[in-house]
A protein has these predicted regions:
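Midchain, well-structured core segments that form catalytic/ion-binding scaffolds
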Residues: 96, 101-106, 110, 146-147, ...
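Acidic, glycine-rich active-site loops and adjacent beta-strand->loop/helix elements
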Residues: 77-79, 140-148, 169-173, 213, ...
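Zn-dependent metallopeptidase/amidohydrolase metal-coordination segment
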Residues: 9-12, 338-341, 345-360, 365, ...
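Acidic/His- and Gly-rich active-site-bordering loop/insert found
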Residues: 2-104
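Active-site-adjacent substrate-binding region
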Residues: 220, 227-229, 234-250, 378, ...
Length: 485
């Protein structure tokens, strides 16, 4: 029996559970894209699937709305896939294991994908209904939002006529997003030179950090949580100061827009220095625990000996350059907004640290609501990377979404909210990328607001979606569509 079958609105939770049963990690969205196409064809709706996998579905206006401006319902089909160490799952072949606990839906030790599966579920439920009044609809579901909004960047809009865009990719009920930061993905490629291990009595050691809370690198960067990659870079530098080490393996984080929760390094050291290494880690553990006692109270550094023999190591120059890059590259909040003191204006997150055969890649999500500051951060990364012998690349650049002084859609949504709930919604500009900016750049007269039901800890295995908030947001959405004549 379906886990969510008894929940209202039934159509929304039915489609959400179906979506959760289809693998749809970023860069692995063909199955979910084809599912959306089949859905539309079964209902004789116009559908276009582009080469990227983006899907556009159109539904005619209901009676009385034939002359109303066209409305776009927009979200993304991909999700961030994260799990705890003890969870066995193949995100490429298996669906999620949903859990319903009272008012909360979550997945068993994995991310839930409410970001942004709930938007897709809303859209499908509206497309499938025959009793919901609405203007002509253009449902636009994009791919690869979570890895740089690549689908929205690549989509063509010549066949779209929407005047209003409802973006269902926000996680705070009662908040209407009316602007966002721009951003890019920046990568520092540090070369590796391998050599035979020439230490007299080498001992292999593994250093790791875990117990961090992580989170979304835009929405939660303001919480100043520890970054596993930066923390281990700092730890390696402390070890390097105490002993002669050679790096063997380095790994931490796979998503530039998720603050990394854990990371590991493998290195070799002379046997006589292993106790010195352990003492250096123990000393730094006390320091880091004190620094992050509020934001990451369970941060833990671990050092242990490896059992396998090591034949090749990074030479001193390439290993030292990698450690220096991890220590020196900027990370976290760089500037708060002068106009809105509670808003992060500029930040970056070292979310990806992965080793290829001949290089280590350090991937950043760079964000700013001021384009020149975003470009300056990119320049800093490039300059330092190249100074240390690496190469720099960037991709996924997207524009900021600037606040509009006049917005009919915003006015309607505020009025509906006040009538339904007796209070004013919070109008906000956020330090995170949403696809609105890209669509508004392509469709100059588009009027857009982003909103959604209450979710917590997105992009982590603790992600939770609140049932009653979904119900209220559904009611809110239907009333908005009813008013947009």
């Amino acid at each position: 029996m379906a886990v969510l079958a008894q929940l209202e609105p039934k159509a929304v939770f039915h489609y959400f559970e179906e979506i959760c049963g289809i693998p749809h990690e970023s860069s692995d969205t063909q199955a979910i894209s084809d599912y959306l196409v089949a859905f539309a064809k079964e209902r004789n709706l116009y559908v276009r699937q582009d080469t990227l996998g983006n899907v556009i579905i159109k539904k005619p206006a209901t009676s009385g709305y034939e002359d109303a401006p066209v409305v776009m319902l927009q979200g993304h089909m991909d999700m961030v896939c994260e799990k705890t160490d003890d969870k066995e799952i193949d995100f490429h072949t298996q669906g999620l294991d949903l859990v319903l606990e009272g008012n909360v839906i979550h997945a068993d030790r994995t991310t839930l994908g409410g970001d942004d599966g709930i938007a897709v579920a809303f859209a499908l439920a509206i497309l499938d209904a025959s009793n919901i009044p609405h203007p002509a609809l253009e449902v636009v579901i994009t791919v690869d939002e979570e890895i740089g909004m690549l689908g929205a960047a690549g989509i063509t809009t010549e066949d779209l006529q929407a005047s209003y865009m409802l973006n269902l990719d926000s996680e705070d009920e009662g908040q209407l997003l009316v602007g966002c930061a721009g951003g890019m993905t920046a990568v520092c490629h540090m070369p590796i030179v391998w050599e035979a291990c020439n230490l007299m009595h080498p001992v292999c050691m593994q250093l790791s950090v875990d117990g961090l809370l992580g989170g979304h690198s835009g929405m939660e960067i303001i919480k100043q949580r520890a970054n596993a990659n930066k923390t281990l870079g700092r730890t390696l530098k402390a070890i390097q100061t105490a002993a002669d080490i050679r790096l063997v393996l380095i790994d931490g984080g796979k998503k530039d827009n998720a603050i990394p929760r854990e990371a590991q390094r493998v290195f070799v050291v002379e046997a006589e220095a292993k106790d010195t290494v352990k003492q250096a880690v123990q000393t730094l553990q006390a320091t880091i625990s004190h620094e992050y006692q509020v934001s990451d109270p369970d941060v833990t550094l671990k050092i242990k000996e490896c059992t396998e023999a090591v034949a090749q190591v990074m030479n001193r120059a390439s290993g030292d350059a990698i450690i220096d890059a991890l220590v020196l590259l900027p990370n976290g909040v760089q500037k708060m907004s002068d106009a809105m003191p509670e808003l992060v204006q500029t930040s970056l997150n070292l979310g990806i640290l992965t080793m290829k055969e001949e290089e280590v890649q350090m991937g950043f999500s760079v964000r700013s609501s001021v384009g020149s500051e975003k470009n300056l951060l990119a320049l800093q990364i490039r300059t330092l990377c190249e100074h240390l012998g690496g190469q720099y690349t960037e991709s996924g650049t997207y524009p900021a979404w600037e606040y509009k002084q006049e917005s009919k859609l915003r006015d309607v949504m505020v009025a509906v909210y006040e009538e339904l709930y007796g209070g004013k919604p919070k109008l906000d500009v956020i330090h995170a990328g949403v696809e609105c900016g890209l669509f508004m750049d392509k469709m100059k007269d588009l009027d857009c607001v982003s909103y959604g039901p209450q979710m917590y800890d997105i992009h982590t295995p603790n992600e939770r979606l609140h049932v009653d908030s979904v119900q209220r947001t559904w009611e809110y959405t239907l009333e908005i569509l009813k008013r947009l004549k």
